Amino acid sequence: MNIRMVLLASAAAFAASTPVLAADAIVAAEPEPVEYVRVCDAYGTGYFYIPGTETCLKIEGYIRFQVNVGDNPGGDNDSDWDAVTAVRFSSRKSDTEYGPLTGVIVMQFNADNASDQDAILDSAYLDVAGFRAGLFYSWWDDGLSGETDDIGSVVTLHNSIRYQYESGTFYAGLSVDELEDGVYQGTFTPGVIPGTTDFTADDGPNNVGVAFGIGGTAGAFSYQVTGGWDVDNEDGAIRAMGTVEIGPGTFGLAGVYSSGPNSYYSSAEWAVAAEYAIKATDKLKITPGRWHGHVPEDFDGLGDAWKVGLTVDYQIVENFYAKASVQYLDPQDGEDSTSGYFACSVRSNHLVDAPGLRIGSTTISF
């Protein structure tokens, strides 16, 4: 009896000491944070990881509207001005045992008017351990910073295989180029203004060229030597170019020699160009320049020709730029001409938005 009373008393005491609770409410679990986009800073700004991979992707491009002024700048009518619009856009990198593997695709869409539009593949190539193969621009596409120099190829975009060695600020490379849209024997038309005429043949025979490029920087001085041999035309060209910081600006000088009209250089037998890019203020750069070339009959037959010009770059506000250029060309045995253009551009590093993250870059010009 006593044991039963003790057990009942203990049970009553335990029940009294236990609080009465209602049924537990349903509480939603906190969502797991999801990392949609990860920044990839191994190759510079603008790259992000493709989700689920260790491959870095960069999406960039521009939209550009530009008005050109001159003698028939459009080439299809007698107008002295022409407006064109172009859109370009990507690059991808990943690490390999041989170093970074880079893949680049650049598409460009052009519109001269509502009925004259096209889309082209501007670049597409693979690059690893100094080897590059695909469609890309050659060293002959480089030039001085202004718009007066005429020291480059008419066509600089080729299907090529290239190896470029780099060490610090020095590089040296060799490329084999397909010159299918270059200058050909029997198709060259003399009597035109150098640098303003398309010397290419439509879907010409596959031609082969070999080019080299050497360049680098040393303090305030930068330099580049470029050469090319056009196998079918059996002619070649070589060019030297350098810049040095002097006073409030940068002085640039270039010279080029061509043994005959070829796909690497066809504007003149020889030419020299000089400019001085004056940094007037933090926002304003003024670049006067001069070009002089000897153009014999087997090139354009214009004799000696010279050109002077002025290019002005101005940063209106952050990421908003304006550019204007005017050029005057006076050939000895041809008519003089004046040309120029004006463009404004908005540049931004914001193409892709994610929570707390913005990726890519774009330029809008008009």
UniProtKB/Swiss-Prot annotation:
Modification after translation, per record: Attached covalently to peptidoglycan.
InterPro entries: Porin_alphabac (IPR003684)
Tagged with keyword Cell inner membrane: no
Subcellular location: Cell outer membrane
GO terms for cellular component: cell outer membrane; pore complex
GO BP of this protein: monoatomic ion transport
Leader sequence segment: 1-22
Function: May act as an outer membrane pore.
Subunit structure and binding partners: Forms calcium-stabilized oligomers.
UniProt-recorded name of the protein: Outer membrane protein IIIA
Organism: Rhizobium leguminosarum bv. viciae
